[in-house]
Curated annotation (Swiss-Prot):
A GO cellular component annotation in the UniProt record: ribosome
Its biological purpose: One of the primary rRNA binding proteins, this protein initially binds near the 5'-end of the 23S rRNA. It is important during the early stages of 50S assembly. It makes multiple contacts with different domains of the 23S rRNA in the assembled 50S subunit and ribosome. Forms part of the polypeptide exit tunnel.
GO molecular function: rRNA binding; structural constituent of ribosome
Record keywords, A-Z: Ribonucleoprotein, Ribosomal protein, RNA-binding, rRNA-binding
Alphabetized InterPro entries for the sequence: Ribosomal_uL4, Ribosomal_uL4_dom_sf, Ribosomal_uL4_euk/arc_CS, Ribosomal_uL4_euk/arch, Ribosomall_uL4-arc
Key word Cytoplasm present: no
Family: Belongs to the universal ribosomal protein uL4 family.
Subunit structure: Part of the 50S ribosomal subunit.
Descriptive protein name: Large ribosomal subunit protein uL4
PANTHER family, per the entry: 60S RIBOSOMAL PROTEIN L4
Top-level lineage group: Archaea
Amino acid sequence: MKVKVFDLNGQPVGEIELPKVFFTPFRPDLIRRAVIASWTHRIQPQGRDPMAGKRRVTENIGKGHSMARVERLKTPPRYAAFVPFARGGRRTHPPKVEKIIWEDINKKEKRLALMSAIAATANYDLVRARGHIIDNVPQLPLIVVDDLQKVQKTRETREIFKKLGIWDDIVRAKEKSGVRAGKGKMRGRRYKKAKGPLIVVGKNEGIVLGARNHPGVDVVVVDNLGVEHLAPGTHPGRLTVWTVSAIERLRELYG
């Protein structure tokens, strides 16, 4: 199947044969597992000192003294110690480094998940269901000449995105971003940022500098492409712009 290739003015300048990866069956179950595996592998195991709260010489005085039968210090002041509800006592169920926190996925399943996520970027229904505005996008998948990789100025990329029809989605991402509700504001997660278009290039020749200041826009080299780029939050169908060299590299990697 052949699709059009567009220049930086949004005009078709040729055609290209789509790689077979764009016809991979939709597998939302594998995509979800792959994204969660990516999330959990960024978590660092944590634990507590096994002796924390236990470095005390205590005794239990037993019953018959009109006092709670808890461990107390042997020397004055004879306050409670060691037990979980005492000041400086141990924790009841502390976190342990042995806890299994990583979700694993088989290599072939991970590869199929990535291929399925790539194919989902060409599905109009999935892209709309994800919330992207594609009314002015000429086609999906949107393929652009390699000149896009060399643009280094934000004002230039803004005009290019307007001509390619993806600027409305960037505006949507800006309007949906804002201060988070709840306690997360105090815990290093003050702002919620919506995801906008993804730019996939064959080689970074300056486009990262030109696109990084646009709200919600991400740029990634095709060799570093992951399921999390294509399906943020486990939801496939992200609006994606491909360069010609990225498409050719996909053909080499996935057929």
